[in-house]
């Protein structure tokens, strides 16, 4: 068993600018439909929720990059960050080529200016 960690922090204003300057094309490229629906339902804090999901995906990329076979590319939407019925975040890996992950623990936080994510990935 191998364990890797990943952490990422981002300014929320950068994500907001990316979304607004591309007329949502950024969202379509980076976030799944379920992620977009969740963030859009947050109204006043939607950019914080978009940013923390972006940060989470970056943290996961950092944690798994050394363990992946470079024969295939990982896309942003191969990793989905959702929340359970109690509001706790969890990760769905949608790319079937990523088979050697046993579990991913995730912690997300955001404030007015920053979003941060920390992940612990356990490999089989």
What are these regions (language model features)?
Residues 1-124:
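Core catalytic alpha/beta fold that binds nucleotide/phospho-ligands
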């Amino acid at each position: 068993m191998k364990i890797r960690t990943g952490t990422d922090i981002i300014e929320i204003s950068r994500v907001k600018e990316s979304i607004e300057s591309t007329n949502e094309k950024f969202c379509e490229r980076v976030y799944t439909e379920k992620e977009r629906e969740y963030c859009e339902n947050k109204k006043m804090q939607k950019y914080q929720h978009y940013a923390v999901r972006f940060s989470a995906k970056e943290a996961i990329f950092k944690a798994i990059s050394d363990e992946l076979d470079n024969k295939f590319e990982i896309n942003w939407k191969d990793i989905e960050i959702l929340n359970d019925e109690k509001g706790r975040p969890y990760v769905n890996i949608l790319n079937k080529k990523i088979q050697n992950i046993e579990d991913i623990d995730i912690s997300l936080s955001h404030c007015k200016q920053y979003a941060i994510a920390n992940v612990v990935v356990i490999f089989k």
